[in-house]
């Protein structure tokens, strides 16, 4: 039998509990429809509150604030409860149809009871959420690291550069600053120190952002790094498009005073595409970037740019000694002296100073240091650390060159000696001779100078002045390394330039050589006959060659470029030069060649022949046989002047460029009246004209003329002709007769009264007048005004020496927008310069003269005096304008 359990409970309590249960359970069923309506209304209210809250959150996040965790938690709860409510609402029609007895009962009492209970609980949850969703503050500023400091090398000797860059950046008008310079020069180090200095500036800037851009520009990667730095990341960022990311970044940064540091730019970074607001004086934001390409500064619209240069010798030595260490330097008394030579090989490049200094830090015998010099001189690429740490970094600039043409032209620069000033004209002539660039008239030179500009702006060449460039020694080693197929085929590119060698390389080395440079050595004689089946280039300029074996040229069938210039003892060439059947470029400039080699006329492919400064040449008869010749340079050449020479020149149908010196009046007249020869003349020197040749008339077709020189001639007037009609200066004209004439010099032309014809040379940059005793004025104001032409708009240098009768350069002030230098010496009658306060906008004008002349100089007014007096530079009375002492 089962047991019996007895429970004691009062009747009243039982009745109360049963009634409560019935009432509550009754509400689950009887109030179901009303409860469902209340649930839907509560859901709508909470969703509206969520949308309002999200709009407010988005607005705050655009200002760079970050949503509060409690707010994000509430939004997440709402997003979780919405589908649960919708599920209950979808069951409404089924559950309502089950109700009966006016909603007091259900056909399925258990199901309706459970459903009604879920509805009531959901109402309670929604109401609680609605109550919790009342936020006065939804986001707050997160004090992320305003500046993330970067590890940096010590600023050895670069402090002045840092101060200069920092001070320039802090100027109100500077928003974008570009730092450009060659690879390894310390641009990233400098930018890192700028970054770290912002941590000590206080709260002037809201945020400093560092981005490494690198060669492959990726806008979205830059955007991602900026957004991460802003600490406003969310899970949806990666799915956004580039345009939306840009908009988000812009809406945050426009409320901030930011600094953006972009390291290693190789192409324009479009700030609009990234979403970065442009810095302005009003928003106070700053952008600084580093690049190896100067042209990027222009593409980025910088307010200022700054070249990061190699260290000065003393500063370079300081850095090098810190890397080597005092113990090593003190381990042998000769090491410091030898170490200076090693350091000098680095030419102030911090990358090389660091790597080579570290390599030598534990080499404590003088023999090891001398060996280092030998390796760095003969084959620097083999030096420890060079191929692994130095040359690959520099090679990025080479790899960035857009064409094979640019790369070939760059490699060619390595044929010159270390630290050599390379004449731009020489480079262009070589490149034309090699066939690297277009050989058409006009195009070739322009293209050559464009290539030089690209290499300079790429920091692969350094521009010394308007005429010359230089290649940094370490960059040169990189070029040689590349040219030798990264050291695998060194014999292809034999460069022993400037080493004071007395002999040519061993015979065996010539067999595979393609380019050989032996310029600037002490070679006196060539007696060997190396077999050179692949040789294309042979540069022997500036040696002491007096003899070349007749067999030397026999085995050079591919030779294209041969430079024998500046060999002062070279008096003849072997006729066997005719066997160089591929030769296109030949320079005999500044040699003592006397006899025209008969074999030269066999060089049917010769395009370029340079005989400038060959005063001893006896004849050039037969030159018309060089039918392919395009460039002929005879400037200051001593060939006899006779009509047959002009006839031969006229037979050169392909001639495009001519430089020449003439002295016979009859030949000069024929030459100037020959339209074809005159039109291709690039430089003309007129010398030793006799007193009967008192007037020189130029034809108005010399539009190629760039240089015009007069010397030791008794001419008293220079005229301009249009065809056969002399053009009087009093007849106005707008014609430009010398559009490319940039240099004019006159020496010992004692009868000239004025040079007013120069008004027809609008692009004149240099004018030198020396010992013109009768010259009274340079430009006659009345004659010039009749032509309505303003002279000297491009003039950069004016040099007047020993012009005793000169009273005026021009009566009245002239504008000189480009003027950089005036030198006056021995012009006692000249008391006033054609200057007023506004004549020269440039701030770097220098006026050089003797102190006594400066003391008597008259000025247009006090303002002019105040403007130009500080530019005057006096040289002592016993020193001439060239710096030589005058003996009395």
Curated annotation (Swiss-Prot):
Ranges in a coiled coil: 22-66
InterPro entries listed in its UniProt record: Apaf_helical, LRR_dom_sf, LRR_R13L4/SHOC2-like, NB-ARC, P-loop_NTPase, Plant_NBS-LRR, WH-like_DNA-bd_sf
LRR repeats: 512-533, 534-555, 558-580, 582-604, 605-627
GO biological process per UniProt: defense response
Function of the protein: Probable disease resistance protein.
Free-text comment about domains: The LRR repeats probably act as specificity determinant of pathogen recognition.
Family: Belongs to the disease resistance NB-LRR family.
Name of the protein: Probable disease resistance protein At5g63020
Organism: Arabidopsis thaliana
């Amino acid at each position: 039998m089962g047991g019996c359990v007895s429970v004691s409970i009062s009747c009243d309590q039982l009745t109360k509990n049963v009634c409560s249960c019935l009432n509550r359970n009754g509400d689950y069923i009887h109030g179901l429809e009303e409860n469902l309506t209340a649930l839907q209304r509560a859901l709508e209210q909470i969703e509206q509150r969520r949308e309002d809250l999200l709009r407010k959150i988005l607005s705050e996040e655009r200002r760079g604030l970050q949503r509060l965790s409690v707010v994000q938690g509430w939004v997440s709860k709402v997003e979780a409860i919405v589908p649960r409510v919708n599920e209950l609402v979808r069951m409404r029609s089924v559950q309502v149809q089950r109700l009966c007895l006016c909603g007091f009962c259900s056909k399925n009492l258990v199901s309706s009871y459970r459903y009604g209970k879920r509805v009531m609980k959901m109402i309670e949850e929604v109401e609680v959420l609605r109550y919790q969703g009342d936020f006065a503050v939804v986001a707050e500023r997160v004090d992320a690291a305003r500046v993330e400091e970067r590890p940096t090398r010590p600023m050895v000797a670069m402090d002045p550069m840092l101060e200069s860059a920092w001070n320039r950046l802090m100027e109100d008008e500077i928003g974008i600053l570009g730092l450009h310079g060659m690879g390894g020069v310390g641009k990233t180090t400098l930018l890192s120190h700028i970054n770290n200095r912002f941590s000590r500036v206080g709260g002037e800037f809201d945020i400093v952002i560092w981005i490494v851009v690198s060669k492959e520009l990726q806008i979205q990667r830059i955007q991602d790094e900026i957004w991460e730095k802003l600490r406003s990341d969310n899970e949806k960022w990666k799915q956004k498009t580039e345009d939306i990311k840009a908009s988000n970044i812009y809406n945050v940064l426009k409320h901030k005073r930011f600094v953006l540091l972009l390291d290693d730019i190789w192409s324009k970074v479009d700030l609009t595409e990234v979403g970065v607001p442009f810095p302005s004086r009003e928003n106070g934001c700053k952008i600084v970037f580093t690049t190896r390409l100067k042209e990027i500064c222009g593409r980025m619209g910088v307010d200022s740019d700054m070249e990061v240069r190699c260290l000065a010798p003393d500063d370079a030595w300081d850095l090098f000694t810190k890397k080597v260490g005092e113990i090593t330097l003190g381990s042998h008394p000769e090491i410091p002296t030898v170490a200076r030579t090693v350091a000098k090989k680095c030419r102030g490049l911090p990358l090389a100073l660091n790597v080579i200094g570290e390599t030598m830090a534990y080499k404590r015998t003088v023999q090891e240091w001398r060996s280092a010099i030998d390796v760095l001189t003969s084959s620097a690429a083999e030096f420890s650390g060079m191929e692994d740490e130095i040359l690959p970094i520099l090679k990025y600039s080479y790899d960035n060159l857009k064409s094979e043409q640019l790369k070939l032209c760059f490699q060619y620069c390595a044929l010159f000696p270390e630290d050599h000033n390379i004449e731009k004209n020489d480079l262009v002539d070589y490149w034309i001779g090699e066939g690297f660039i277009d050989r058409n008239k006009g195009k070739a030179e322009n293209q050559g100078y464009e290539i030089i500009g690209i290499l300079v702006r790429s920091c692969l060449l350094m521009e010394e002045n308007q005429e010359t460039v230089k290649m940094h020694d370490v960059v040169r080693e990189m070029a040689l390394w590349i040219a030798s197929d990264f050291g695998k085929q060194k014999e292809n590119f034999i460069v022993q330039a400037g080493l004071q060698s007395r002999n040519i390389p061993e015979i065996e080395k010539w067999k595979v050589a393609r380019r050989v440079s032996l310029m600037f050595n002490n070679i006196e004689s060539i007696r060997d006959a190396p077999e050179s089946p692949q040789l294309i280039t042979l540069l022997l300029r500036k040696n002491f060659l007096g003899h070349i074996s007749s067999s030397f040229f026999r085995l050079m069938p591919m030779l294209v470029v041969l430079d024998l210039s500046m060999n002062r003892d070279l008096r003849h060439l072997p006729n066997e030069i005719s066997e160089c059947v591929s030769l296109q470029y030949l320079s005999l400039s500044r040699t003592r060649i006397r006899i025209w080699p008969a074999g030269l006329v066999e060089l049917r492919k010769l395009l370029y022949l340079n005989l400038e400064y060959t005063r001893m040449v006896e004849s050039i008869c037969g030159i018309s046989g060089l039918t392919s010749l395009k460039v002929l340079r005879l400037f200051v050449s001593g060939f006899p002047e006779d009509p047959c020479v002009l006839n031969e020149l006229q037979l050169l149908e392909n001639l495009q460029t001519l430089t020449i010196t003439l002295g016979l009046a009859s030949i000069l007249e024929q030459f100037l009246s020959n339209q074809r020869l005159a039109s291709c003349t690039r430089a003309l020197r007129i010398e030793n004209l006799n007193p009967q040749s008192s007037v020189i008339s130029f034809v108005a077709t010399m539009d190629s003329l760039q240089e015009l020189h007069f010397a030791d001639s008794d001419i008293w007037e220079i005229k301009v002709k249009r065809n056969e009609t002399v053009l009087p200066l009093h007849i106005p004209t707008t014609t430009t007769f010398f559009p490319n004439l940039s240099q004019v010099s006159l020496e010992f032309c004692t009868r000239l009264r004025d040079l007013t014809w120069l008004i027809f040379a609008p692009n004149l940059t240099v004018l030198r007048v020396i010992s013109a005793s009768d010259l009274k004025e340079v430009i006659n104001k009345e004659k010039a005004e009749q032509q309505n032409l303003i002279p000297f708009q491009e003039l950069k240098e004016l040099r007047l020496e020993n012009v005793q009768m000169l009273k005026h350069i021009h009566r009245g002030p002239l504008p000189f927008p480009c003027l950089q230098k005036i030198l006056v010496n021995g012009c006692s009658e000249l008391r006033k310069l054609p200057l007023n306060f506004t004549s020269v906008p440039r701030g770097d004008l220098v006026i050089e003269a003797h102190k006594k002349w400066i003391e008597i100089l008259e000025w247009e007014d006090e303002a002019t005096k105040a403007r130009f007096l500080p530019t005057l530079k006096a040289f002592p009375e016993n020193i001439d304008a060239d710096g030589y002492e005058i003996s009395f």
